[in-house]
Amino acid sequence: MAQVQYYGTGRRKSSVARVRLVPGEGRIVVNNREISEHIPSPALIEDIKQPLTLTETAGTYDVLVNVHGGGLSGQAGAIRHGIARALLEADPEYRATLKRAGLLTRDARMKERKKYGLKGARRAPQFSKR
């Protein structure tokens, strides 16, 4: 019989993560590499594992992730969002816990566009009185 799998798609900034939860011993694989190889920051790795620790499922699922776009912070946020959605598919009982922690909400903050006449989104050129 086919193995049980749960899917979740997470997004953050310009990153998109497709997450698959498979019953296992708790390995996290990102783009066919161990998580520590793909994301060097321990703080971001802890951030990614947050949905698993909150629902106490850290050692019960292997997490297989395909992620593209954005930088490390955006990718970490997208993976976290995807894991939360996949856990919800695995067991709808987790909704209250994940919702309270704010893990099911897509973070809508994006980079503000640069405006003409300015040096950045809001930074104005230096003002000279004389």
Swiss-Prot record:
GO cellular component, one term: cytosolic small ribosomal subunit
A GO MF term: RNA binding
Keyword Magnesium: no
Coiled-coil parts of chain: none
Membrane-traversing stretches: none
Database matches in InterPro entries: Ribosomal_Su5_D2-typ_SF, Ribosomal_uS9, Ribosomal_uS9_bac/plastid, Ribosomal_uS9_CS, Ribsml_uS5_D2-typ_fold_subgr
Key words, A-Z: Ribonucleoprotein, Ribosomal protein
Superkingdom of origin: Bacteria
Keyword Isomerase included in the entry's annotation: no
GO biological process: translation
One of the Pfam families matching this protein, by short name: Ribosomal_S9
Protein family per UniProt: Belongs to the universal ribosomal protein uS9 family.
Protein's UniProt name: Small ribosomal subunit protein uS9
Organism: Bacillus velezensis (strain DSM 23117 / BGSC 10A6 / LMG 26770 / FZB42) (Bacillus amyloliquefaciens subsp. plantarum)
